[in-house]
């Protein structure tokens, strides 16, 4: 009888383990590459900051939700003449990182410290004018093929209304990463 009780105990304790049986293996492979191209003429260092000054716009230019205004070019040049580490034929692309200034909708929140405008965010745009929503797959599609050891990633940045806009300052930032494939 004791053996039967022990067998029942072992079976009872081992049955939940069957629910956690291994069904397969996920293998992850990747590649970490050396940053081989300069960014706007400066060696990559994590501090390759780019400043974009948006023009002043009237609140009347942003009177409906979703209206955009003040589109301003954002150009990031990778490589340069004679930079053999920035290989011709590779494709440069940029990823805008989902950081503390990114709204749930994928725009850049206004973080102006003094007299901020309200109901306005900053939006990034691809070279074809389509809007980018940071963190949403398929919305950031600008790429540039390196030729002559250089390429330029062309984007634009502008204001976007999220409600009835009030006048004031606009300031924000976003982190970015470049890749070359």
What are these model-predicted stretches?
Residues 9-13:
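Hydrophobic helical h-region of N-terminal Sec-dependent signal peptides
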Residues 16-18:
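N-terminal signal peptide c-region/cleavage motif recognized by signal peptidases
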């Amino acid at each position: 009888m004791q053996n039967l009780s022990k067998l029942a105990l072992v079976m009872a304790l081992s049955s939940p383990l069957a629910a956690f049986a291994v069904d397969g293996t996920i293998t992850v492979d990747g590649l970490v590459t050396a940053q081989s191209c300069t960014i706007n003429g400066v060696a990559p260092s994590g501090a390759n900051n780019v400043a974009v000054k948006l023009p002043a716009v009237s609140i009347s230019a942003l009177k409906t939700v979703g209206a955009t205004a003040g589109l301003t070019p954002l150009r990031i040049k990778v490589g340069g003449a004679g930079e053999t580490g920035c290989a011709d034929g590779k494709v440069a692309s940029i990823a805008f990182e989902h950081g503390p200034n990114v709204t749930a909708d994928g725009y850049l929140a206004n973080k102006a410290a003094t007299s901020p405008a309200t109901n306005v965010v900053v939006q990034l745009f691809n070279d074809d004018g389509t809007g980018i929503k940071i963190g949403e797959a398929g919305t950031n599609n600008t790429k540039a093929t390196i030729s002559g050891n250089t390429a330029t990633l062309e984007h634009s940045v502008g204001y976007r209304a999220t409600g009835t806009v009030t006048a004031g300052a606009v300031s924000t930032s976003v982190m970015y990463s470049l890749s070359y494939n």
